[in-house]
Design a protein with these regions (language model features):
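Fungal secretory targeting signals
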Residues: 1-18
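Active-site-adjacent segment of 2-oxoglutarate/Fe(II) JmjC oxygenases
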Residues: 199-257, 381-436
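A short, N-terminal "cap"/entry segment at the start of jelly-roll beta-barrel domains
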Residues: 16-130, 230-313, 317, 323, ...
Length: 442
């Protein structure tokens, strides 16, 4: 009788108990080799775990419950999402997805640059804000254009020149670098160009989650869509002058290399400079020092033109956390620049869900939902932008609320049957100093 290799393997597999077979294919790590991701680990307090930083492989075991994984896996994604693989025991109920990575967004590649977007189409909860990540090499131009939505931007790397025109006919030119912002109100025409030595990369933010980068009003698109006789009449030139205009939109393209602003500023008889300032140096702001990091807030208070977008730039130190809080006036749209974090969103009715974020991720937290941002790493900082479709930045601190509410009221709510616990808690909040990023406990 002849046996195939496969039949021999199958008979061997059937001879082994299923639990043993599973462990052979997916070995159960001991506590020393895989941290808390094993059936023996007990953690009643749901401590954070930096699986990526500590090279651990998350598995769905929690306090003795759970099992191995037998099906297809993406281990890299699992390591980036330890609190999805093993959620805190306090998670309960259902929430829409609140996380998207720009790494999962389609990239449009053009001459000397590229662009990708995160909108309500990619992330269904991103209803108030859309984001675009764009790269322009040295001399590369994002062509003259405008759009229905206001545009706010943060320079991630490199140097960029912006131009704009206001409704009074005033022109504006500025050169920006990492950490700088610009804001163009709805309908205001503008352009962008990468500067020496390596161009630029930036995050664009629009005050409408349904924005589409493919549907902006482009100069070349309009000109090619207009009869040449009309162009001639509008510019008082012969129609033949427009024979060589582009036959299709340019969008992103290699331009001639820019000179200095002084050399390039228009100098016609009726040219005038805008009275508006479309740019702002966010990272040059004096930061608010906290016990766990640095906070910079930019809204219409210190960047007056930015009427529809407010933002905070946070440096969350190793082991620190953005305190428990909520925002009453807008959804939070977060962009993670550096580090690894976990965020638990409290949605009322006993519903809470924890998400993990790494560099390049977008997070959404609907207005009024309580949350925090905890740095998973004890060695590296988290750098994140909190962005809001709002004129001013607003938040409520749970710590301040507890400290500025009558002690009896607080104790009756939380520690009615625990006088000792009440005493410790009330002492901790008796001086409710503002501390939006809290240092790790010593």
């Amino acid at each position: 009788m002849k046996f195939s290799v496969w039949s021999l393997l199958a008979s061997t597999a059937l001879a082994v108990p299923l639990s043993d077979w599973t462990q052979q294919q997916h070995p159960i790590a001991d506590p020393e080799s895989n941290g808390p991701y094993n059936p023996k680990n007990k953690d009643p307090y749901d401590h954070k775990v930096d699986s990526y930083g500590k090279n651990l492989q998350p598995l769905p075991w929690r306090n003795g419950e759970g099992a191995t994984m037998m099906g297809p896996r993406n281990k890299d994604r699992e390591r980036q999402n330890p609190d999805m693989m093993r959620p805190p025991s306090t998670d309960h109920g259902s929430l829409p997805n609140m996380r998207w990575s720009f790494a999962d967004s389609h990239i449009r590649i053009e001459e000397g640059g590229w662009t990708r977007q995160t909108t309500v189409r990619e992330l269904g909860s991103s209803v108030e804000i859309a984001g675009v990540n764009m790269r322009l090499d040295y001399g590369v131009i994002r062509e003259l254009h405008w759009h229905k939505q206001a545009e706010w931007a943060y320079v991630l790397e490199g140097n960029v020149r912006v131009t704009a025109l206001d409704t009074e006919g005033g022109q504006f030119i500025d050169d920006l670098q990492k950490g700088d912002l610009w804001y163009f109100p709805s309908g205001h025409p503008h352009s962008l160009q990468g500067l020496s030595p390596n161009g630029t990369e930036f995050l664009l933010v629009f005050d409408d989650g349904s924005f589409d980068e493919e549907s902006t009003f482009l100069l070349t698109d309009w000109l090619k869509s207009t009869p040449k006789s009309v162009l001639a009449e509008n510019f008082k030139l012969a129609p033949e002058v427009f024979e060589t205009i582009p036959k299709k939109e340019k969008y992103i393209f290699q331009g001639t290399l820019p000179g200095s602003i002084k050399d390039e500023e228009p100098k016609g008889a009726n040219v005038k400079k805008s009275k508006l300032n479309f740019t702002h140096k966010m990272l040059d702001q004096e930061p608010r020092n906290t016990t766990g990091g640095l906070v910079r807030i930019t809204d219409s208070t210190n960047f007056p033109i930015s009427k529809t977008i407010a933002a905070a730039h946070l440096d969350i130190g190793p082991g620190a956390m953005r305190e428990m809080h909520w925002h009453p006036n807008a959804d939070e749209w977060s962009f993670f620049i550096k580090g690894r974090a976990r965020v638990t969103i409290f949605a009322a009715d006993g519903t809470a869900r924890t998400f993990n974020y790494v560099a390049g991720d977008v997070g959404v937290i609907p207005r009024n939902m309580g949350h925090f941002i905890e740095n998973l790493s004890d060695d590296e900082p988290v750098e994140v932008l909190e962005i809001f479709k709002a004129e001013k930045f607003q938040d409520f601190s749970l710590f301040q609320w507890m400290g500025e509410t009558p002690k009896r009221m607080v104790a009756d709510h939380i520690f009615a049957d625990d006088p000792e616990g009440a005493e410790k808690f009330l002492k901790a909040v008796q001086n409710p100093v503002e501390d939006p990023i809290r240092a790790a406990p010593e």
